[in-house]
Amino acid sequence: DNNRSSQENRVKNNRLAYAGAWKKFKRFFTFFGERLVQPTNHYSRKRQYSRTYGYALIILATVMSAFVTTHLIHSLIGQYQLFADISILPSLTSTPNYIWMFIRFILFYAVFYLGFPSVSYGLKHVFQKRQHVFNYWLTQYEGMNVLAIVLLAVATVMTFISPVWLFVGILIVFFAHILLYIVTFTSSMFKSATESTIDPIYLSLIGLVVQLIITISLLLILF
């Protein structure tokens, strides 16, 4: 009887765990769909969605970007080596360690994607006197980047299909998603424009320059 009762409790707990996980999963995709349709729409409540959604979107973007970049480099080097073997092009004496390259791109993109909201948060705190809770604000901020995540997913699928033949298309989609991140950053400066001590255009320029310095510094350090 004790064993049967214990087994029934485990089954019940497992069902509750699955139901809870499914509910969280469903809420995330509800958030994702709403932000895709209306990226800048205000929430009905300030903390309507989980404070972890922003981090989840950054992780998704980081992993997909690292994969796309590493796989493109791997495919292009392989294609060059193939042409070098059948032509007078010089052969490569060595090839990169792609696992280590992927890890470095993970670090690079993690800081890159977190840099945009962090710089925006700092500027809004200092110049616009906004007192946000960072984790919840990050969810709202990254919600405006859902379309960029979709474009990045498209680039990832294209990379799976044919990174060489679809190279130009992949680059176009990939850089389009980066442009959307820049648009989101600029938009975040204008949302509190009436409370700013500095014109939001100049705030945006300051923030983008800071982000550019961070990006170039990371590239020099990691690569």
Segment roles from a protein language model:
Residues D1-V63:
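N-terminal juxtamembrane cytosolic/stromal segments of multi-pass membrane proteins
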Residues V68-D85, L222-F223:
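Membrane-helix interface motif
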Residues N13, A17-G20, K24-F31, R35, ...:
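Juxtamembrane loop-helix boundary motifs flanking transmembrane segments in multi-pass membrane proteins
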Residues P39, G78-Y98:
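Perimembrane loop-to-helix junctions flanking transmembrane segments
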Residues I213-F223:
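Juxtamembrane boundary at the C-terminal end of a transmembrane helix
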Residues A61-S65, T69, F112, F116, ...:
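Alpha-helical transmembrane segments of multipass membrane proteins
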Residues L89-V154:
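Alpha-helical transmembrane segments with an aromatic anchor "belt"
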Residues F127-V210:
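Hydrophobic alpha-helical transmembrane segments and adjacent short intramembrane/lumenal linkers
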